[in-house]
Amino acid sequence: AKHLFLKCEQVGPLKYPDIYDIVKKCAERLELVVPIVFVRGDMDKAQVYSVASDIIEPCIVLSKQVVEMCSKEELMFLIGCECGRIQNNHCAYNMAFTYLNYNKYTYRPVERSYKQTVNNQLYTALVQWVKYADITANRAGIICLDKPGMFISVITGLYNKGYIDFYGRQQKNMDTDGLIKKAE
């Protein structure tokens, strides 16, 4: 598991204090113990992921690109989503999903993937699970926002900046105003 934390700097009150304040606020709003947060400098994509297991303390890893491109609200949403994944024990299933070779943008813990065929039922179950777990994580992210009504603007802003989520999904040129009208 140590390859997950290579070239990482731990967030704290002295290093990345703005991010540390966001993490504390999200943990408080979700009634969660403050997770460890790392900023990882060796990733080539703007991604965020969380890790937790019986042998690893719950932690969130932000790529340096995410830290540099995101506004405070966008970071609050992303960190809130990862806190939700930790709170709901989604981390193990998320890591299992990475080995399905779902698409080339999916986060992979190391440069290898599962080469054998995966049972169709297992594949379908994990893909469906990801869809519903992501809704739960987004709800946690919305709870963490100072202005939850800004969710659509925050999420479209992230994707329009080139954000690729943990599952490899990306969506450029999202129409914020069109989505807001549909939501009304």
Report residues per predicted region.
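Acidic/histidine metal-binding catalytic segments
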Residues: I36, C91-T98, K147-T156
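Catalytic Zn2+-binding segment of zinc metalloproteases
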Residues: E82-N103
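Active-site His/Glu-centered metal-binding helix of metallohydrolases
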Residues: C70, I79-N88, T136, A140
